[in-house]
Amino acid sequence: EPGSAYKVNMEGALNVASECRSSGAKLVYISTDYVFNGLKGARYHEFEPADPLSIYAKSKLEGERVTLDASRGNLVCRVSVVYGWNRLSGKSNFVTWVIDSLRKGQEIRLYDDQLVSPTYAPSAARDILELGLGNLKGICHTSGPDCLSRYDIGRLVAETFDLDASLI
């Protein structure tokens, strides 16, 4: 729902940014690669203009804007396709969804016309903590090093976990 996306991603960031400014604290805002339209066919860099297509992406870009407008010392970290084992809530992510689907013998359809940089959650957490504690400010891409389609990721997951890649 558009209203809740903006309430969480823009208004929430604005509220936190205001409190951080009042207390002199640095805000590290976690954003997304979805702020780009994905048509480039290669890795995006921090200095490239955003062109969000979805309500979610537009709300995240607004969250970035209010974060950076609140203080020149704030940091925006963009991540992409975050994955890992979520032992606390059991909530799935793209990689665990692929594993679960293939283990159940379900055929899945994955697109190959958009590239993403999958990001291992523990690595992202470590990197973002280091960046937040340092002097970096502005926008930083903190995604993984690879640039792959979701189809490619699915095939790698199937191969890694010895699952039936023909279901992809």
Residue ranges and their predicted role:
Residues E1-V28:
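NAD(P)-cofactor binding segment of oxidoreductase domains
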Residues A13-V16, E64, I128:
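Conserved internal alpha-helix within the Rossmann fold of NAD(P)-dependent oxidoreductases
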Residues E19-S23, A70, F161:
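Helix C-cap/helix->beta junction micro-motif
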Residues L27-T32, N37, C77-V79:
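SDR active-site strand-loop-helix element
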Residues D33-L53:
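Active-site "gating" loop of Rossmann-like NAD(P)-dependent oxidoreductase/epimerase domains
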Residues S59:
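Active-site helix of classical SDR
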Residues R65-V116, P122-S123, L129-E130:
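NAD(P)-dependent short-chain dehydrogenase/reductase
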Residues D127, L131-I168:
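Mid/C-terminal beta-alpha module of Rossmann-like enzyme folds, strongest
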